[in-house]
Amino acid sequence: MSNVNMDFEQAGELKIGQVGIATLRIRTLNVPRLIQEMSDRVTRAPKLFRRTAVILDFGELPHPPDLATAKALVEGLRAANVLPVAIAYGTNEIDLLSQQLGLPLLSKFRAHYERQEVAAPPPQSTPPISTGRIQHTTVRSGQQLYAEHCDLTILNTVGAGAEVIADGNIHIYGTLRGRAMAGARGNAEMRIFCRDFQAELIAIAGRYKVLDDIPTELRGKAVQVWLEQNQIKIAALD
């Protein structure tokens, strides 16, 4: 079984969401580097990332950026053909920053920041994964197929420009030419299995790889894709 893993530290981690909006989790407040990383992503996969909407998440920084730095980041991302559309909810300083930038806050990120200020509520149980959804026909370019709380099995082809998403695992018994995203609600244990692997993009729990990041020796092969230590792994099936 061949295995491929390409690890490198990034100033910003881009996670793909299930509704077509990505989250840019900023790890290092190095504006030129962040802009260059996003510009490189657009260059490698323009159909996926050009003019893509992103949410800026400053939650991993010890302090939010000042207004001048935040403006430089937003303007630089726009110049790189990436569109910041919101800021992840955070502290009062981030609230003020969002107002100054004219970007809305997303309240679903509130718990991430208030975790240490209030007692944590009991963990919510994850909805059980059902028996799964089966797709018999081709998923054509421009179509999106989502299997909520279950696995997705496709007995045909996923065309270029098509998108298949599942909260569980994804099994594709034809050719994958489009995008496949498993573990869409954040379950990092989910996997993608494919008989003929020619994907534009693959993602597990938001972590992703695009076509140019996938070794050529795996294209056209039967593979499995999984997440290990927050890194996408791809292996040919024997």
Swiss-Prot record:
* Similarity field: Belongs to the MinC family.
Q: Show the SUPFAM superfamilies listed in the entry.
A: Cell-division inhibitor MinC, C-terminal domain
Coiled-coil segments: none
Organism whose genome encodes this protein: Xylella fastidiosa (strain Temecula1 / ATCC 700964)
Quaternary structure, from the entry: Interacts with MinD and FtsZ.
Database matches in Pfam families: MinC_C, MinC_N
Lineage of this protein's species? Bacteria, Pseudomonadati, Pseudomonadota, Gammaproteobacteria, Lysobacterales
Q: What is this protein called?
A: Probable septum site-determining protein MinC
Q: Where are the transmembrane segments?
A: none
Q: What is this protein's function per UniProt? A: Cell division inhibitor that blocks the formation of polar Z ring septums. Rapidly oscillates between the poles of the cell to destabilize FtsZ filaments that have formed before they mature into polar Z rings. Prevents FtsZ polymerization.
The protein's UniProt keywords, in alphabetical order, are: Cell cycle, Cell division, Septation
The reply to whether Ligase figures as a keyword in the UniProt entry is no
In the record, biological process GO terms are:
cell morphogenesis; division septum assembly; regulation of cell division; regulation of cell septum assembly
Family matches, as InterPro entries = CAP/MinC_C (IPR016098), MinC (IPR013033), MinC_C_sf (IPR036145), MinC_N (IPR007874), Septum_form_inhib_MinC_C (IPR005526)
Q: Does the keyword Hydrolase apply?
A: no
